[in-house]
């Protein structure tokens, strides 16, 4: 039978509940326990798929095509375990399910109420994750802050859950903040005390307090917090601000979080294998030469809008012994100031996904600059579509070429709506979503990077390359290096003769992991490193490779 851990947060929002949940998952997995993590979000949207990135950050897509909270990306990256649509629950989806049941008559004419129907549906979703995943431990993060009206049904549901499984099979973690007041020179515990008081009023006594702070927490303070909040001193876990989110599991392990959880849940403490993770953090803190990467996007004012892209770049830099020097470039600024002024000196350019025509001309200009200046380029989803438009206009002779999404009346719709999307009216959950296979063409950069004939990648799009222009693109120099197995959909393109120029219709960033970077991102960083001034050892290695290549070339004499 599964064990259950519930993670709540208090005092302020964005306290780091998701990282705590993901870190605990990492620590449990390092001891041989299987883990699944789900997020309960208190907003009324059915899912975040139609929400603005400025409101919510990126939308993370699961293998089965769910559009979910970005925290699921943290869960997958930390535990290296694929989540599903069951791992993302919103108030909107709960109410939708309950109302549908009421309309079908499932409640036999009874009055439908928050208790027991809404809370019962929430509990059922948690049980469903346990049954579907078969995990030893199911960790549930409750979104929002204790005291919010929106979170009350979720908190009541996890209180009731204790009756479902018994007290020895679940644990409550409360993440809170200890603010430092400069005038008094002290970390203050009163906000934490009041947050726990709110939680107790609901009927939940936390087993562990994870206390965020920007400076060390001494034993006297831990005793004070434990005494006022009713937890053992050892269960007051300091969580100091870290230089990287990947350092948090190590910090929490040193403070005893996992041992305390194992004790509460009556689980055996197996030997922990965190060696690779410790090495990863060491490399993060001791990086190699910086690689300058420009991320050209529409939503660059909010870094979380491209969270998985940034993490994928970090993973690639880690493996390549490089440090990431990221420049956030607003696509609209390129339209105003030109690409040369904003991209000069960059070692690589990434154009990620997005929607709408704002900033598209800037993205196209950035892609043209990368192509002509021979700067390594990677396009993702809309980034591939912009690369197609750029080539059509400037190399294939298709004046005015565009996407049917951006310019419905364009004379050359090189990007058009997928046939199966023609009659779709609703926006939410109706795109081409989730994992689809892609067949890699032989003798291509893609084949070199992947080393596979067929790969499986996550998608989120309605528009696709228009095959009416396929032959023209090939004849003008484009290489279609990846397609759907039936050859109908173009998934991956590249340019031969360029140091690194490739773009894909899918989202490879969702599959990148610490220590296991996605091949496309690793290839980009590897190509970018070739632009860096070579160290003496590296220069010697490159010269050696050049000499070997020259010896292998057939003679042209005679």
UniProtKB/Swiss-Prot annotation:
Region (Disordered): 536-558
InterPro entries: Class_I_gatase-like (IPR029062), CTP_synthase (IPR004468), CTP_synthase_N (IPR017456), GATASE (IPR017926), GATase1_CTP_Synthase (IPR033828), P-loop_NTPase (IPR027417)
Record EC number: 6.3.4.2
Record field: compositional bias (Polar residues): 542-552
Binding-site residues for CTP, renumbered to this chain: 13, 148-150, 188-193, 224
Pathway assigned in UniProt: Pyrimidine metabolism; CTP biosynthesis via de novo pathway; CTP from UDP: step 2/2
UniProt keyword ATP-binding present: yes
Pfam families: CTP_synth_N, GATase
Catalytic activity: UTP + L-glutamine + ATP + H2O = CTP + L-glutamate + ADP + phosphate + 2 H(+); L-glutamine + H2O = L-glutamate + NH4(+); UTP + NH4(+) + ATP = CTP + ADP + phosphate + 2 H(+)
PROSITE patterns named among the record's database cross-references: GATASE_TYPE_1
Role summary: Catalyzes the ATP-dependent amination of UTP to CTP with either L-glutamine or ammonia as the source of nitrogen. Regulates intracellular CTP levels through interactions with the four ribonucleotide triphosphates.
Quaternary structure annotation from Swiss-Prot or TrEMBL: Homotetramer.
Protein name: CTP synthase
Species assigned in the record: Prochlorococcus marinus (strain MIT 9303)
Encoding gene (name): pyrG
